[in-house]
Amino acid sequence: MFLKHLTIQNFRNHEELSLDFDSRLIFFVGDNGEGKTNLLEAICILSWLKSFRESEDSNLIRWGSENYFLRGKIKNNLKESVLEIGFTSKPSVKRKLKFNQEEIKKRTDLIGKFITVLLTPMDLKIIEGGPAERRKFIDAFISSFDPFYLEFLLEYNKILKHRNALLKSGNLDISHLSIWDKKIVEKGIFILNKRREVVLELNSFYRVNLDKLSGGKDGLELIYKPNVKDQDEFLEKLNRNLSRDLRLGYTSVGIHRDDLFIGTDQRDITEFGSQGQKRSTVIALKAATFNYYKDILNTIPVLLIDDVIRELDVKRREYFVDLVVTAGQAFFTTTDLEGIQDYVGKLKDQKQIFLIRQGKVEPIK
């Protein structure tokens, strides 16, 4: 996949931008606070339909404006398409999505249209943030290519909310609750099986990547640890824990309690990992998602790399350059104009550089 053009209006600190991309490596260069990461964020929203930094769309609107607008022209193989996202802070209309000028009502209809892999310093949260962050990571990854998974996940969360409301109310009708139990198990088992299948594949890529990054020193694994193993156990645990759940006011068992173990010999990386090991794990994990798209789904995503490479030592930087060579297109943010040559590798003639200064974005020849 290639992003050929990006239009931005009233997004973050950028009033209006129209950028054409005709190279494989795109660098956004500027001092901290100039808005480099805002450009990657705009590209991410075209891909994920949400920001990786901000949960509220209204906070993405440029100060003094009422809306923002993003347009991307995407090339996949020989086919070009246009993806547009508009958001207004007015009460009447919130977000509007268009694909090739046709309005899109369901976000699942845009899954797979523009796939990106983002690497940012914030990714350390996957390692350090515990089970919730790791579930969020695996759910976001699978949802990026499987619309059924996303629909089941959204349904599961709705059912969970209803069940929790029933538990909190104290007015418990067992026959009513059993209806929700059957629904939550049905949705949950689909999610469980998909997570299990995908994590198994990801682990094979992750281990190879980590061996390259650590020279074989870090024998870590990804292991999916479900809270329930199958449909029968899920139902049995819901029934067995009913008294406890009534006391707590929420559902204490289910796939919303799963974990993605990252470590070795039953010890999670958070217990022993150095910052270097954690950084290697994040890179190996994100690279594994790239491998999955490429080798399992036959899609080469766009790489988005936010000010990460300057923190890497020589060995990790060399690995990253090799990864970039296999990608179709990669976008980087950096403060170091002089250091760009260190990580373009064999692609030094296939780069574009944009200088970001005081809200303006200018190409450097």
UniProtKB/Swiss-Prot annotation:
<keyword id="KW-0742">SOS response</keyword>
<keyword id="KW-0234">DNA repair</keyword>
<dbReference type="GO" id="GO:0009432">
    <property type="term" value="P:SOS response"/>
</dbReference>
<dbReference type="InterPro" id="IPR001238">
    <property type="entry name" value="DNA-binding_RecF"/>
</dbReference>
<dbReference type="InterPro" id="IPR042174">
    <property type="entry name" value="RecF_2"/>
</dbReference>
<dbReference type="GO" id="GO:0005524">
    <property type="term" value="F:ATP binding"/>
</dbReference>
<dbReference type="Pfam" id="PF02463">
    <property type="entry name" value="SMC_N"/>
</dbReference>
<keyword id="KW-0227">DNA damage</keyword>
<keyword id="KW-0238">DNA-binding</keyword>
<keyword id="KW-0067">ATP-binding</keyword>
<dbReference type="GO" id="GO:0006302">
    <property type="term" value="P:double-strand break repair"/>
</dbReference>
<dbReference type="InterPro" id="IPR018078">
    <property type="entry name" value="DNA-binding_RecF_CS"/>
</dbReference>
<protein>
    <recommendedName>
        <fullName>DNA replication and repair protein RecF</fullName>
    </recommendedName>
</protein>
<dbReference type="GO" id="GO:0005737">
    <property type="term" value="C:cytoplasm"/>
</dbReference>
<keyword id="KW-0547">Nucleotide-binding</keyword>
<dbReference type="GO" id="GO:0000731">
    <property type="term" value="P:DNA synthesis involved in DNA repair"/>
</dbReference>
<feature type="binding site">
    <location>
        <begin position="30"/>
        <end position="37"/>
    </location>
    <ligand>
        <name>ATP</name>
    </ligand>
</feature>
<dbReference type="GO" id="GO:0006260">
    <property type="term" value="P:DNA replication"/>
</dbReference>
<dbReference type="GO" id="GO:0003697">
    <property type="term" value="F:single-stranded DNA binding"/>
</dbReference>
<comment type="function">
    <text>The RecF protein is involved in DNA metabolism; it is required for DNA replication and normal SOS inducibility. RecF binds preferentially to single-stranded, linear DNA. It also seems to bind ATP.</text>
</comment>
<dbReference type="InterPro" id="IPR027417">
    <property type="entry name" value="P-loop_NTPase"/>
</dbReference>
<comment type="similarity">
    <text>Belongs to the RecF family.</text>
</comment>
<keyword id="KW-0963">Cytoplasm</keyword>
<keyword id="KW-0235">DNA replication</keyword>
<dbReference type="InterPro" id="IPR003395">
    <property type="entry name" value="RecF/RecN/SMC_N"/>
</dbReference>
